[in-house]
Amino acid sequence: MAKEELIEMQGSVTEVLPDSRFRVTLDNGHQLIAYTGGKMRKHHIRILAGDKVSLEMSPYDLSKGRITFRHLAGRGPGPSSSR
């Protein structure tokens, strides 16, 4: 599967599950199970319930996703940026 086929979405973490998995509610209301991407795991980026995240999903399985970015209020890309 090529990277062009991935769907990028925004959501918020509603529950922290065992084994580095998270229950995420997307902005459109859909819920799915997501895991942290490789670089986030490598650099020990901590994700807590209530955090806003960006994630990638495969168009073939919309019940799973990979968290690629944790948004902090006032920093990073997105509408909440102060730049």
From Swiss-Prot:
<dbReference type="GO" id="GO:0043022">
    <property type="term" value="F:ribosome binding"/>
</dbReference>
<feature type="domain" description="S1-like">
    <location>
        <begin position="1"/>
        <end position="72"/>
    </location>
</feature>
<dbReference type="Pfam" id="PF01176">
    <property type="entry name" value="eIF-1a"/>
</dbReference>
<dbReference type="GO" id="GO:0005829">
    <property type="term" value="C:cytosol"/>
</dbReference>
<keyword id="KW-0694">RNA-binding</keyword>
<comment type="similarity">
    <text>Belongs to the IF-1 family.</text>
</comment>
<keyword id="KW-0648">Protein biosynthesis</keyword>
<protein>
    <recommendedName>
        <fullName>Translation initiation factor IF-1</fullName>
    </recommendedName>
</protein>
<keyword id="KW-0699">rRNA-binding</keyword>
<comment type="function">
    <text>One of the essential components for the initiation of protein synthesis. Stabilizes the binding of IF-2 and IF-3 on the 30S subunit to which N-formylmethionyl-tRNA(fMet) subsequently binds. Helps modulate mRNA selection, yielding the 30S pre-initiation complex (PIC). Upon addition of the 50S ribosomal subunit IF-1, IF-2 and IF-3 are released leaving the mature 70S translation initiation complex.</text>
</comment>
<comment type="subunit">
    <text>Component of the 30S ribosomal translation pre-initiation complex which assembles on the 30S ribosome in the order IF-2 and IF-3, IF-1 and N-formylmethionyl-tRNA(fMet); mRNA recruitment can occur at any time during PIC assembly.</text>
</comment>
<dbReference type="InterPro" id="IPR004368">
    <property type="entry name" value="TIF_IF1"/>
</dbReference>
<keyword id="KW-0396">Initiation factor</keyword>
<dbReference type="InterPro" id="IPR012340">
    <property type="entry name" value="NA-bd_OB-fold"/>
</dbReference>
<dbReference type="InterPro" id="IPR006196">
    <property type="entry name" value="RNA-binding_domain_S1_IF1"/>
</dbReference>
<keyword id="KW-0963">Cytoplasm</keyword>
<dbReference type="GO" id="GO:0019843">
    <property type="term" value="F:rRNA binding"/>
</dbReference>
<dbReference type="GO" id="GO:0003743">
    <property type="term" value="F:translation initiation factor activity"/>
</dbReference>
